[in-house]
């Protein structure tokens, strides 16, 4: 009975295919006479003999191993099946698709910033893409000792070094610490190159790295939003005028009744006219080109808190916009 069992042909295939599995090794010790190889779409089959690559087959289909595979192997191409003996070989099935993985910093990383001795705590998140590129390196470094390998294994490796790379490239490419998203493309490009160098020796390549967002502490985000409001209306006086107009429109200012409503409406109209006049004056001044006077120069001390200013366009102490 055991004699006939040894003669049963194998079906060499990756049956339990998973999208998150990078490769799977079929190693049932012997390939019997009459066995078939099944390659499904999105898979490559690599024949191995004693750890050496005998052949790589990339076209999906159903193949007779004796007549359609063995003739194309390297050292085993002359192999003949015996009456009661099979071919000792392993078959590595590789997932050929490009993998997309989400990433995010587990904890905030402190980026050096002016006026912040401990650095600016920042979180970030996004995605990266990778795929298998070199089967020889993959086998030498990973597949030689593992029967299967998952996307999660790669993600763990990437996350372990990502904080250092973010700090490196934010410091190098981040032109404005309060608006890092403006330089997200350059930061991501540098990180992708470094990650690719980490994985290329293992037979994989990083084909893309994207930063979806940078996240600041709430108090810093509030300061950024406040400064954006200042910049949008031009100066503090205009900001106060808009705030007062909004307060009257929402009914939050003191006073009630028809007289109060009428007074509020008249005041709002007057402020709106003043704001329009100021905006028109600014537009005319801008259209006339840059002036040689120092009215648009950066002050030596912050007008809001009095702190001495540096090279940045914002006060290092309170975040006040300086120019």
Swiss-Prot record:
Pfam families, sorted:
Band_7_1
Protein name from the UniProt record: Uncharacterized protein YdjI
What organism does the record attribute this protein to? Answer: Bacillus subtilis (strain 168)
What lineage, starting at the top, does this entry show?
Answer: Bacteria, Bacillati, Bacillota, Bacilli, Bacillales
């Amino acid at each position: 009975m055991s004699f006939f069992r040894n003669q049963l042909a194998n079906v060499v295939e990756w049956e339990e295919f998973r999208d998150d599995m990078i490769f799977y090794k079929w190693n049932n010790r012997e390939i019997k006479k009459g066995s078939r190889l099944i390659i499904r779409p999105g898979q490559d089959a690599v024949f191995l003999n004693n750890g050496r690559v005998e052949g790589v087959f990339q076209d999906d289909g159903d193949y007779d191993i004796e007549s359609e595979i063995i003739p194309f192997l390297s050292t085993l191409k002359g192999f003949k099946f015996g009456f009661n003996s099979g071919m000792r070989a392993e078959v590595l099935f590789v997932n050929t698709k490009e993998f997309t993985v989400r990433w995010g910093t587990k904890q905030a990383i402190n980026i050096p910033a002016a006026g912040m001795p401990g650095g600016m705590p920042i979180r970030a998140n996004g995605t990266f893409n990778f795929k298998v590129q070199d089967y020889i390196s993959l086998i030498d470094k990973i597949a030689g000792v593992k029967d299967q390998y998952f996307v999660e294994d790669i993600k763990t490796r990437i996350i372990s070094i990502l904080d250092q790379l973010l700090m490196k490239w934010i410091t190098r490419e981040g032109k404005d610490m309060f608006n890092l998203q403006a330089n997200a493309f350059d930061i991501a490009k540098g990180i992708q190159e470094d990650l690719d160098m980490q994985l290329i020796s293992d037979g994989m390549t990083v084909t893309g790295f994207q930063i979806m967002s940078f996240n600041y502490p709430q108090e810093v985000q509030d300061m950024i939003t406040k400064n954006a409001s200042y910049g949008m209306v031009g100066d503090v006086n205009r900001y106060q005028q808009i705030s007062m107009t909004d307060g009257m429109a929402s009914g939050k200012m003191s006073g009630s009744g028809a007289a109060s409503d009428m007074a509020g409406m008249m005041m709002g109209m007057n402020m709106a006219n003043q704001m329009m006049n100021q905006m028109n004056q600014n537009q005319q001044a801008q259209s006339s080109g840059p002036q040689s006077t120092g009215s648009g120069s950066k002050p030596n001390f912050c007008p809001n808190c009095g702190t001495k200013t540096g090279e940045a366009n914002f006060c290092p102490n309170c975040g006040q916009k300086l120019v």
